[in-house]
Amino acid sequence: MTIQELHTHAMELAEQADFLNMQGKDAEAKSLYEQSLQAEKEAAYQARNQQIGEPSESVLFRSAASLAYGLKDFREAERFICMGLAGNPPLDVAHELRELYDQVSLERNLEQMNMNLPENQHEAVTITIPVKERNLLKVLVRKFGWACVF
């Protein structure tokens, strides 16, 4: 398959997996997400090996990293993020890769600290975060669904 065909196939599989997820068919969805990741991974590595250039290469690695992140394969997600940043991605893609890296790092740290709390164990907390730490705050808000006042 060509790079474009692999990428298209990966996105179709991910879309099917999303649909299954909405139906509560988690095991079937996970299987499709894994197949999607394999296709996107192959597309990304083919793109890099064939040196098709930017932004295509970094976008494919970002996509593969997102799929790995969704599957909670944080180490694999980190690898794809690094591969995407190792090229010469456009600034916006590099920014997205770094934001995804922040999310992956947070998840890995929480996993290592065994802090995955059940939904019903959330509580109200007030914190002050310096302006330069806003990206971390965004990650925390997305992860935990926190309400924030800026």
Describe the function of each predicted region:
Residues 1-3, 42-54, 87-94:
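Flexible helix-coil transition and linker loops at the boundaries of alpha-helical arrays
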Residues 6, 13, 20, 60-61, ...:
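TPR repeat positional signature
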Residues 52-74, 100-123:
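Alpha-helical linker/edge segments of TPR/alpha-solenoid repeat scaffolds
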Residues 29-42, 74-76:
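Helix-turn-helix repeat elements of alpha-solenoid scaffolds
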Residues 2, 9, 28-29, 36, ...:
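Residues that mark the junctions of alpha-helical repeat units in TPR/alpha-solenoid scaffolds
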